[in-house]
């Protein structure tokens, strides 16, 4: 009988452990709409804005693969009231009539893995809105404060990084670029925080020089 009880106990522990997915930090990634439309084979149906808007909030790991499509702990669907704000800060750049599909995909693939910091679907989107608006992690505004405007000029990597550092407790961001012809455009900027989502950290895993998304030291168009 004791052996049966022990077996049941171990089985419960294994089930609980297998349903808990670990992560080390969050990536809060924003994409520059104009560059996304310029560098992608998929045509944007709507004219892009000269703004960085949300791509996603992703639980990530320092080592090994990032978690994806995790079991959902608590079900609380996204409130319609939030969608008015999401339409502004988190549009589907390629087709704004498909915003809901984009949000659903980001929640299912990434947000579902943020437990316990992210408690449910509604909390995931509330957290992103808070980070972008209340916590002033709007990359466009951070750059603008440093007099770096989206005027199509070519910038030095260090100038962009330093501007972002000034708005992120001097922590290093992750930049993604895309080369089109002879022009390299700034496509995404990622801010990283600890697993609580409360404190900035240096972003690990920068793109290597052999990557098509590597940002050179100079002549980055923004």
From Swiss-Prot:
Keywords: Disulfide bond, Endonuclease, Glycoprotein, Hydrolase, Lyase, Nuclease, Signal. One of its GO terms (biological process) is RNA catabolic process. Disulfide bonds join 37-44, 70-113, 177-215, 192-203. Residues 1-22 form the signal peptide. It catalyses: a ribonucleotidyl-ribonucleotide-RNA + H2O = a 3'-end 3'-phospho-ribonucleotide-RNA + a 5'-end dephospho-ribonucleoside-RNA + H(+). It is an enzyme of class 4 (lyase). It comes from the Eukaryota. Its EC number is 4.6.1.19. The keyword Glycoprotein applies. The active site is at 55 (proton donor), 106, 109, 110 (proton acceptor). SUPFAM superfamilies: Ribonuclease Rh-like. One of its GO terms (cellular component) is extracellular region. Pfam families: Ribonuclease_T2. One of its GO terms (molecular function) is RNA binding. RNA binds at residues 31, 55, 92-93, 102, 105-106, 109-110. Glycans are attached at residues 40, 138. N-linked core structure at Asn-138 contains xylose. Belongs to the RNase T2 family. Self-incompatibility (SI) is the inherited ability of a flowering plant to prevent self-fertilization by discriminating between self and non-self pollen during pollination. In many species, self-incompatibility is controlled by the single, multiallelic locus S. This is Ribonuclease S-3. It comes from Pyrus pyrifolia (Chinese pear). The lineage of its organism: Eukaryota, Viridiplantae, Streptophyta, Embryophyta, Tracheophyta.
């Amino acid at each position: 009988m004791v052996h049966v009880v022990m077996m049941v106990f171990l089985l419960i522990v294994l089930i609980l452990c297998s349903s808990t997915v670990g992560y080390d930090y969050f990536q809060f990634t924003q994409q520059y709409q104009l560059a996304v439309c310029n560098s992608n084979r998929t045509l944007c149906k709507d004219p892009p804005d000269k703004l960085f808007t949300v791509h996603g909030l992703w639980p990530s790991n320092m080592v090994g693969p990032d978690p994806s499509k995790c079991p959902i702990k608590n079900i609380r669907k996204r409130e319609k009231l939030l969608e008015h704000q999401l339409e502004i800060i988190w549009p589907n750049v390629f087709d704004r009539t498909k915003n809901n599909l984009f949000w659903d995909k980001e929640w299912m693939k990434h947000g579902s893995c943020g437990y316990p910091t992210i408690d449910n679907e509604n909390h995931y989107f509330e957290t992103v809105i808070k980070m972008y608006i209340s916590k002033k992690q709007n990359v466009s505004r951070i750059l603008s404060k440093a007099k770096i405007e989206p005027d199509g000029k070519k910038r030095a990597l260090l100038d962009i990084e330093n501007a972002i550092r000034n708005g992120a407790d001097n922590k290093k961001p992750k930049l993604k670029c895309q080369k089109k012809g002879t022009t390299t455009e700034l496509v995404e900027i990622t801010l990283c925080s600890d697993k609580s989502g409360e404190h900035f950290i240096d972003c690990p895993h920068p793109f290597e020089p052999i990557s098509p998304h590597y940002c050179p030291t100079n002549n980055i168009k923004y």
